[in-house]
Amino acid sequence: MLAKRIIPCLDVTNGRVVKGVNFVELRDAGDPVEIARRYDEQGADEITFLDITATSDGRDLILHIIEAVASQVFIPLTVGGGVRTVEDVRRLLNAGADKISVNSSAIANPQLVSDATGKYGSQCIVVAIDAKRSSAPGEPPRWEVFTHGGRKATGLDAVEWAREMARRGAGEILLTSMDRDGTKSGFDLELTRAVSDAVPVPVIASGGVGGLQDLADGIRLGHADAVLAASIFHYGEHTVGEAKAFMAREGIPVRM
């Protein structure tokens, strides 16, 4: 089994790291450069930056933040938020990003994923999917894709959309459960497993981590290849090193 990754996520708005619950009630968590440096020192495998209001606010890319982080942090950086064109992908890669995450723009223009992967390779294009359970109790499970920071329903089925994005060349799927985001009640394992089992590319589980066991469950029960978390790391409940040590004790291969 390949080593599983632990990825701290920095949600950024107005130049600050924030964390909310169910995509709202945002709380300040600090300076992005300082926080990224701390996670690098703790042994994070990667860091993900998401400008969570860039698309809905119509703002430009967070190039200055990525340049500052890339000059001080030496692990892979994934960056998303406000990416609308292949030119935006180029600008972020030049600023120091290693992978680019697209979400709302992929739904508005699926060809963007095909074009970006054609030019820069699948390994640097991540498709982020924000999904919310839409099936009633007793019905077969179904999840709908949302965009614009969880504000806009699309009518798309999350599992089918993940399949389509993988067909178009996406190298990874970053899958967030909107129902679990910030709740600390654990990943939506049914959602994570449904998508992980449906696509041939790695799936990063996101949304709901409340403790170290949740990280292990995302890998073992959700079939994810990587786990992403924010609150438990930002507010000092656990370090990345503690998370890796726990995973290793659980028999999950990690890079120590």
Swiss-Prot record:
Q: Where is the active site?
A: 11, 130
Q: Which UniProt keywords apply?
A: Amino-acid biosynthesis, Cytoplasm, Histidine biosynthesis, Lyase
Catalysis: reaction(s):
5-[(5-phospho-1-deoxy-D-ribulos-1-ylimino)methylamino]-1-(5-phospho-beta-D-ribosyl)imidazole-4-carboxamide + L-glutamine = D-erythro-1-(imidazol-4-yl)glycerol 3-phosphate + 5-amino-1-(5-phospho-beta-D-ribosyl)imidazole-4-carboxamide + L-glutamate + H(+)
Q: Which CDD domains match?
A: HisF (cd04731)
Q: What is the top-level taxon of the source organism?
A: Bacteria
Give, as one word, the top-level EC class.
Answer: lyase
Secretion signal, residue range per the UniProt entry: none
Which Enzyme Commission numbers does its entry carry? Answer: 4.3.2.10
GO BP term (any one)? L-histidine biosynthetic process
Compartmental location: Cytoplasm
One GO cellular component term noted in the UniProt record for this chain? cytoplasm
A single GO molecular-function term is:
imidazoleglycerol-phosphate synthase activity
In its keyword annotation, does this UniProt entry include rRNA processing? no
Q: In which pathway does it act?
A: Amino-acid biosynthesis; L-histidine biosynthesis; L-histidine from 5-phospho-alpha-D-ribose 1-diphosphate: step 5/9
InterPro entries in UniProt = Aldolase_TIM, His_biosynth, HisF, IGPS_HisA/HisF, RibuloseP-bd_barrel
Role this protein plays? IGPS catalyzes the conversion of PRFAR and glutamine to IGP, AICAR and glutamate. The HisF subunit catalyzes the cyclization activity that produces IGP and AICAR from PRFAR using the ammonia provided by the HisH subunit.
How does this polypeptide assemble, per the annotation?
Answer: Heterodimer of HisH and HisF.
Record-linked HAMAP family: HisF
Q: Which PANTHER family match?
A: IMIDAZOLE GLYCEROL PHOSPHATE SYNTHASE HISHF, IMIDAZOLE GLYCEROL PHOSPHATE SYNTHASE SUBUNIT HISF/H IGP SYNTHASE SUBUNIT HISF/H
Family statement: Belongs to the HisA/HisF family.
NCBIfam families referenced in this protein's UniProt entry, alphabetically = hisF
What is this protein called in UniProt?
Imidazole glycerol phosphate synthase subunit HisF
Organism equals Cupriavidus metallidurans (strain ATCC 43123 / DSM 2839 / NBRC 102507 / CH34) (Ralstonia metallidurans)
Which classification does the entry list for the species? Bacteria, Pseudomonadati, Pseudomonadota, Betaproteobacteria, Burkholderiales
